[in-house]
Regions:
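Short, Lys/Arg-enriched N-terminal segment that forms or immediately precedes the first helix
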Residues: 1-7
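N-terminal helix-turn-helix DNA-binding core of bacterial DNA-binding proteins
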Residues: 8, 14-52, 78-85
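Alpha-helical residues within the helix-turn-helix
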Residues: 47, 58, 64-65
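Beta-hairpin "wing" of winged helix-turn-helix
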Residues: 65-74, 81
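Short, charged/polar, Gly/Pro-enriched secondary-structure boundary elements
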Residues: 86-90
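Residue-level signal for well-ordered alpha-helical positions
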Residues: 93-94
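A common structural junction motif
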Residues: 97-98
Length: 98
């Protein structure tokens, strides 16, 4: 776990909002045709953000590099999910380390 990469990822409000959406995908992405258990399609995240695809892709890449989300390619689509184990480890370390 790279603490600095996680702090960098969390420093941006859009990336924090994406993590909130991915925490409850049923509430934010109910229109997705694929099962949400697979994650949320990058295109759905693009649409909700209201930003260019390249900007959202860069935000998702930062979250992925920090280990906060996982990605899975299915055909032409990429699905993203929160990595709850990494998030828990980060929160535990933050809580106990400061």
């Amino acid at each position: 776990m790279d603490i600095d990469a996680i702090h960098k990822a969390l420093a941006n409000p859009v990336r924090r909002e994406i993590l909130v959406w991915l925490k409850e995908p049923e509430a934010y992405f109910s229109e997705q045709e694929f099962p949400l258990a697979s994650g949320v399609c990058a295109g759905q995240i693009d649409a909700r953000c209201g930003m260019s695809q390249s900007t959202v892709s860069a935000h998702l890449a930062t979250l992925h590099k920090a280990g906060l989300v996982t990605s899975k390619r299915v055909g032409q689509w990429i699905f993203f999910k929160r990595d709850e184990a990494v998030i828990k480890e980060f929160l535990d370390q933050l809580r106990n380390g400061l």
